[in-house]
Amino acid sequence: MTVTRPRAERGAFPPGTEHYGRSLLGAPLIWFPAPAASRESGLILAGTHGDENSSVVTLSCALRTLTPSLRRHHVVLCVNPDGCQLGLRANANGVDLNRNFPAANWKEGETVYRWNSAAEERDVVLLTGDKPGSEPETQALCQLIHRIQPAWVVSFHDPLACIEDPRHSELGEWLAQAFELPLVTSVGYETPGSFGSWCADLNLHCITAEFPPISSDEASEKYLFAMANLLRWHPKDAIRPS
């Protein structure tokens, strides 16, 4: 069996998508169950921040490139479809979803981020939500994870150019080699109410994969086969990083 589909067939997704909820503005929240699912299946996420689209495009390309029957891991291509549609980091309520998860360290009030990679200050204000897990996108993702019980999660972001894995695991090392990014145990600042914090409360292994500042076009060329190999990764198979 060939590992990849012919390029001419990659313009559309293979069948098999499901809905796990709706966004604040009513967009369907879509996930891609793994055709070759097992107890060892993980979950791969992108699009938590709507202004971070290079990993969304690359993950989409990988989903359409890999032969579907080889995919071992579940995918949520876009956690925040309203933000992606509007080009916002936040959801349509102005809430940073990565500060809204019902983690023990959630903090009420405001959070700040950098306008872009050239900005020196974190001075753009977003909200963390009225309460932990207040947003429909957050609630739906938490429910999905409780339902499918993934063995691990890899959450894609940008532009910090690193693989953050507090456990320094075999998968973390593989990701660092495959994507040619440094492996770190922390991004260096507090992230109260983040998805990773919530996963830590559940003892669910979460790795945050941060692309560098990169265009979608370049990312889909540079990282396509690393992403496709992640979709079928298994430690026993010793899949080469690239």
From Swiss-Prot:
Q: What is its main location?
A: cytoplasm
For the Peptidase M14 domain, which residue ranges apply?
A: 1-234
Q: Which InterPro entries match?
A: MpaA, Peptidase_M14
Example GO CC term: the record gives: cytoplasm
Give the record's keywords alphabetically: Carboxypeptidase, Cell wall biogenesis/degradation, Cytoplasm, Hydrolase, Metal-binding, Metalloprotease, Protease, Zinc
Q: Give the source's domain of life in one word.
A: Bacteria
Per UniProt, the enzyme's principal EC class comes to hydrolase
The UniProt entry's GO biological process terms, in alphabetical order, are: cell wall macromolecule catabolic process; cell wall organization; peptidoglycan catabolic process; proteolysis
Cofactor binding note: Binds 1 zinc ion per subunit.
Q: Which cofactor does it need?
A: Zn(2+)
Q: Does the keyword Ribonucleoprotein apply?
A: no
Note the PROSITE patterns from the entry.
Answer: PEPTIDASE_M14
Note the subunit structure: Homodimer.
Q: What is this protein called?
A: Murein peptide amidase A
Source organism? Escherichia coli O157:H7
The organism's lineage?
Answer: Bacteria, Pseudomonadati, Pseudomonadota, Gammaproteobacteria, Enterobacterales
